[in-house]
Amino acid sequence: QNKFISRIISGRNLSVKITNKGYSEIVKLSSILQKSLDSSTSVVNLQGTLVSGMGEGAYYMGLKGYTKQFKSKIGYVPFPGTLNVRLDKKIHQEAMKQFETLDGVKIKSFSDGKRTYGWVKCFSAKLNNSIKCQLIILERTHHDESVIELISKTCIRKNTKLKDGSKISIKIEIDN
């Protein structure tokens, strides 16, 4: 009914498999239970590879409807662009699902009269244990679930020796 499991009948044998939708629900429930049981700060560590984006981050990050909110809610106007990281392991992609249930710092959706721009959730993070940044979760994105986006005060690529193919570690602290 909810498509959380699939039943496979083969002769007299019946197998039950958890679907991707079911797995996502389990991850969400696990996150909710963990939050209710543990009031301390937890840390999510992710690893991936720096990849080029489509250049759209610069456009969206420069929109006044976003920049005003970023300034008031995270304390700065981010560099106009995002740093795209492809998560190399499935376990890191699965770890990202818990952010769907977490509040983060919410940047509200807005309209400019012609179109509506989706909400953004920000989570404080550290790139390679040294560079302060924000992991952003977007209401709308062209990326698949293996690619995450980071924002910062400055152009991370320019201020570091990072380039496409560089290995990246991201540490996100979550207040429960």
Region annotations inferred by a language model:
Residues 43-70, 76-77, 92:
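Short Lys/Arg-enriched alpha/beta "domain-start" segment
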Residues 22-45:
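Conserved segment of winged-helix/HTH DNA-binding domains
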Residues 163-167:
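Loop/turn positions that initiate beta-strands
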Residues 11-26:
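Basic, amphipathic "hinge/linker" alpha-helix immediately C-terminal to the N-terminal HTH DNA-binding motif
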